Amino acid sequence: MAEICCVKEIQEEDVEKIRLPTRPELDIPDSDHEDPTVNEEEGCKTPTSSDHKIPEVKYTLCPPAPRKPKPNRSSGTKRKLTPVNVVNRIPIDLSREIEMFFEDLDRRIKKSRKQ
């Protein structure tokens, strides 16, 4: 345990000697004291002459916004009718047959209720 005490005494006495010195040889310039000529020579530079500028276009009116095309009326049907299909259609009047069908049903229902 005597050795541990000696180590503590050395650390407390020679704190200044043990600290690592800072490196003053590194010259880091402050951002406030930058030289503007150094920055121009080092990096890329955007051309600012009038030859390199985009010419101004003088329009008094802007063109209208593009519009969505209107759908065709015939495109709503799944099947397109050909002239042959249109010609072959024959109108049929089935109203009498429908009335007769419902009359028969009505009679059957009345008969089943009576029994």
From Swiss-Prot:
Protein origin, superkingdom: Eukaryota
Region (Disordered), start-end ranges: 17-82
InterPro entries for this protein: SMR
Compartments where located: Nucleus
Compositionally biased residues, Basic and acidic residues: 17-36
Any one biological process term the GO annotation gives: regulation of DNA endoreduplication
Function: Probable cyclin-dependent protein kinase (CDK) inhibitor that functions as a repressor of mitosis in the endoreduplication cell cycle.
Protein name stated in the entry: Cyclin-dependent protein kinase inhibitor SMR3
Organism (species): Arabidopsis thaliana
Source species taxonomy: Eukaryota, Viridiplantae, Streptophyta, Embryophyta, Tracheophyta
